[in-house]
Design a protein with these regions (language model features):
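Short helices/loops that flank or line small-molecule/ion binding pockets
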Residues: 91-92, 100-101, 105-119, 132-134, ...
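Flexible hinge/capping segments at coil-to-helix
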Residues: 28, 148-165
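A ligand-binding cleft/hinge motif common to bilobed small-molecule-binding domains
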Residues: 123-131, 176-179, 202-203, 207-236
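Periplasmic-binding protein-like
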Residues: 141-148, 213, 217, 221-259, ...
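Ligand-binding clefts/hinges and TM-proximal coupling segments of bilobed small-molecule sensing domains
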Residues: 42, 47, 172-192, 227-234, ...
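Bacterial lipoprotein signal-peptidase II cleavage site
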Residues: 18-39
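Extended ligand-binding regions for polar small-molecule ligands
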Residues: 83-92, 164, 171, 217, ...
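Extracytoplasmic small-molecule ligand-binding "clamshell" domains
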Residues: 44-122
């Protein structure tokens, strides 16, 4: 009998409390859910991404082989402008850089899956990249150029209508081809990396390649493996930046380090070493 009375009293108290406070509590939760769930989801990455990288003690950097940004030199050393710059930034942030070669066409997928923490590899700051990732400010200048074999008659992209033109899949070069009235009428073939594009033109299996000026300056012409190739046209001017996951606070942290490295002359020294122009 005592147990029944106790149960009855407990139930009554619960109903009383629910009547007094339940409506307000439910309203508050509903309001918070309606106004804050999206913000919480968006801010989760911003609040945790830099900490996530620091707790690991390393920044996993996605790259493709691309001289002068990330490549292995004649002595077997992994080097390049982006390699050295990323290493300097990581030192300032107190983490180690880990460079992982990626498929450029699926770079954002790998970023979102946390296979990598950032894309740092002469990456053009396109509208699409800036809409789908958290990017740093621009740190270097670039342009898309047309490369052909020496001796090729070329006056404009109109000469390439119906010809075989190559570019790296998912690259700014591919976008330049798609956006040019004449190049859009070429027989376009995508390649895995920009260096494959040079190989195709040198071998005569492609008539032209559209790729980064920075790479072309470093890899073609007298004294290079592609001495028979030349730049004949400059298309879109552009700038490079680093991409982190959308909403990440790591991009702002890297921007702050960029400011330090510009102020102390480190970035200019690297630009001079690799024959690049820093962004304004």
């Amino acid at each position: 009998m005592k147990r029944l009375v106790s149960a009855f009293l407990a139930g009554a108290m619960a109903l009383s409390l629910a009547a007094c406070g339940g409506a307000a509590s439910t309203s508050t939760v509903a309001s918070s859910a309606a106004s804050g769930s999206a913000a919480a989801s968006a801010s989760e990455t911003a609040a945790s991404d830099l900490d996530y990288i620091k707790k690991k003690g390393k920044m996993v950097i996605g790259y493709t082989v691309y001289e002068p940004m990330n490549y292995t030199d004649a002595d077997g050393n992994f080097t390049g402008f982006d390699t050295e710059l990323a290493t300097a930034v990581c030192e300032k942030l107190g983490v180690e850089p880990e460079f992982v070669e990626i498929n450029w066409d699926t770079k954002v997928v790998e970023l979102d899956a946390k296979s990598i923490d950032c894309i740092w590899n002469g990456m053009t700051l396109t509208d699409d990249i800036m809409a789908n990732t958290a990017t740093t400010k621009a740190y270097a200048k670039n342009a898309q150029v047309v490369v052909v074999k020496d001796g090729t008659d070329y006056s404009s992209t109109a000469d390439l209508v119906g010809k075989t033109v190559v570019a790296e899949a998912g690259s700014a070069g591919e976008a330049a081809i798609e956006g040019d009235e004449n190049l859009a009428q070429a027989d376009y073939v995508s390649k895995s990396v920009q260096t494959d594009c040079l190989m195709e033109v040198a071998a005569g299996t492609a008539d032209a390649a559209v790729l980064d000026l920075t790479l072309a300056n470093a890899m073609i012409g007298k004294g290079t493996d592609y001495a028979s190739l030349k730049i004949v046209d400059e298309l879109n001017a552009e700038e490079y930046g680093v991409a982190f996951r959308k909403g990440s606070d790591a991009a702002a942290a890297v921007d702050a380090v960029f400011d330090e490295l510009k102020a102390d002359g480190t970035m200019q020294a690297l630009a001079d070493k690799y024959d690049l122009a820093l962004a304004d």
